[in-house]
């Protein structure tokens, strides 16, 4: 279905566009212009000068609306995702705190299933841990924190293509090898819950780490 929003203040990469229009087909943006001329065949929505912005992409989210992604169930995933979809989020990376392998696999199975649905808002799974610095655990579960182990993470990565981001503390033994491996598989490596110094971060960058999570 073709839809056109007119008479809107639109946020674009170049700034705000006043009195513009947004043309969409099946909820996908086709065109943004500063012309309010109606497109033949489109359902018109008059924004009456209100703001129109692209949908939010939630890259770090542990749950919502009473649903916790750590539960790993479809019910928990859908509850949390629907809660965020009601408030402007259109894409989401469900996030797990430090978990056991069975917990990761349960969530990965659910995530894979939801990603396969038409027009799914789920873009992939984010693992915040469990290869973190114990001294910087914060709200993480310390009993699940450990050093990177290729005998553990390689089978996980090979089995679950839904994993798109994985966080680690680069000062841990084996963390550089871990970063090189996962980035070679197309997974974003992020520095997190760490006591890394400058040289550690520099080495991490050279080993594929390109993002940061929870520095404190």
Task: Place the predicted regions along the sequence by residue.
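Histidine/acidic residue-rich metal-binding segments in metalloenzymes
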Residues: 116, 145-215
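Divalent metal-coordination and catalytic microenvironments
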Residues: 8, 22, 27, 49, ...
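Divalent metal-dependent hydrolysis catalytic cores, especially in the metallo-beta-lactamase
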Residues: 62, 78-107, 120-133, 160-171, ...
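Short amphipathic alpha-helices and their capping/turn segments at secondary-structure boundaries
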Residues: 40-48, 107-119, 199-206
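Active-site mouth loops of central-metabolism enzymes
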Residues: 63-75, 139-146, 188-192
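Histidine-rich, glycine-flanked metal-binding segment
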Residues: 1-4, 10-53
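Generic structural signal for well-ordered alpha-helices
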Residues: 81, 105-112, 153, 179
């Amino acid at each position: 279905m073709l839809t056109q929003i007119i008479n809107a203040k639109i946020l674009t990469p170049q700034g705000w566009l006043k009195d513009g229009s947004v043309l969409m087909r099946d909820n996908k943006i086709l065109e943004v212009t500063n012309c309010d001329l109606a497109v033949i065949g489109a359902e018109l929505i008059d924004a009456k000068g209100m703001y129109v912005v692209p949908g939010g992409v939630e890259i770090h989210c542990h749950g919502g609306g009473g649903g916790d992604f750590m539960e790993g169930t479809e019910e928990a995933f859908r509850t949390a995702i629907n809660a965020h979809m009601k408030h402007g989020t259109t894409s989401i990376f469900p996030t797990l705190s430090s978990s056991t392998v069975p917990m990761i696999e349960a969530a990965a199975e659910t995530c894979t299933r939801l990603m396969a649905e038409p027009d799914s808002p789920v873009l992939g799974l984010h693992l915040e841990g469990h290869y973190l610095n114990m001294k910087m655990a914060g709200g993480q579960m310390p009993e699940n924190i450990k050093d990177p182990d290729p005998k553990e993470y390689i089978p996980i990565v090979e089995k679950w293509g839904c994993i798109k981001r994985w966080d680690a503390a680069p000062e841990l033994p084996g963390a550089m090898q871990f970063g090189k491996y996962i980035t070679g598989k197309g997974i974003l490596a992020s520095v997190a819950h760490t006591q890394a110094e400058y040289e550690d971060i520099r080495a991490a960058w050279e080993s594929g780490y390109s993002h940061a999570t929870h520095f404190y």
